[in-house]
Amino acid sequence: MEIRTTEQFDKWFRKLRDRKAKAKISARLRQCEISDHITGDHHGIGGGISEMRFHFGPVYRIYYTIDNDVLVILLIGSSKDDQSRGITEARKLLALYRGE
């Protein structure tokens, strides 16, 4: 499974100060690539967007979409505290990706 990221996701990930969280998130994404499917706690939130949940720290979330069953686009990340903002931003990014 190929995983691509948006600039917004990359910026969010770079700003994460919790090294353990970054390592756990990176490990899970590598596991998804290797196993060729989304692993761990995840579910659809509607409109073609799903979220991966990471139950440590402030409970991180990564919003993503799947394109053609092989490409995962990581739209943006957030914590539980700014979840609604993260979902709104993910919807905007998906619309841009789709050319809407």
Regions found by a protein language model. Give the residues of each.
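Basic, Lys/Arg-enriched alpha-helical interface segments
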Residues: 1-59, 68-72, 79-100
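Short, surface-exposed charged micro-motifs
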Residues: 63
